[in-house]
Amino acid sequence: MTIAKPDETIVKEIEEQRPPFPAGLLSRQEKDRIIERCIRALYRWYTVRSQESRNWHPDSSFNWRALRTDHSPELNTVIEGFFAIEQYVPDYTSKATHMMRKSYGRSQYQLRWGAEEEKHADLWLNTLLFLRFRTPEWIEDYMDFLRNGEWQLPWDDALHLTFYTVIQERATQLNYLNLELIAMGKSDKPGFTNSADPVLVKAAKTIARDEAAHFNFFLELARLYLYYYPAQALEALVEVIKHFGMPAMHLLPEESRFAEALYQGAIYGPRQYTRDVLQMALKNLGIPNRKAIDEGIKRSRQVPDPDGNMRDTVIVDALDYHAVETAVMRLFDRVRKHEEKIGLTEIDPTYFVPSGITIEG
């Protein structure tokens, strides 16, 4: 039987649709390059979105003179604690930036993140000043004391730090969302009732939106690692969960009083962490629950595909790999649209590359 040569127009159409990357198993270097490239593109998308939708200032965006000055000691303790945590922004920013300095996207984003956290520090400083339960002199002395301490990174590699930050950013967002409810007068907890304050509502809402944006950025990074390095990423996530703690708490002289106020106000505690932080983060990562992630990975091995190429076959107890893949593809599509809008697709486009990994189980 003679096989007819396909029409040239059909051949041309197929070639035009061929992805600009080789098929087959990706090397570690290729995976790292793809991840880095996507992070860079995501960072650039993020900065545009940030300036368009969250362009506020801690001095001029709030009517600080209208802030109540008769809040309860318990609520004042919470505000003072938030102020204290933000005094370590120079450490949060500089140490992570230094560790990520070889990654353009990660280091550039960390600088942007630090600029946004700087606004949070100024916001809580203004809040503490206008609450008037502490004198400016006391606040100045307390700030000096706090800044004599130094926070250290909880992990010294990008993979672990990514998953740590996913959980931490969601926890921080939840703190501010629950503070917003208190400031709306919706709390029935002793020491937090009758706390309605429109200025504090706006402050908590504004900063919670920033934390949501931070959470979503690091969530996208975590999905990239889960997609291209599922076994290693899950192992890192398990380790982070086992050792997780909120940053800089141990550096506060009133750590126990602050933690107790958060707990009594139902702002943040073990229940909120398990139900509203960890479970929510795991769900967004394609993992149904804590028990599933604790079971970890059964085995990871390489097997030949039908063409004889060796591919990773990762058997995972509870990772919805297809959902992760869909989310990663959606991310690449988002940054592609951004690059199209500004013209980068004509010069240096970012492409999605399939991982080539098969998930069984």
Language-model-detected regions and their locations in the chain:
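Non-heme di-metal
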Residues: 2-361
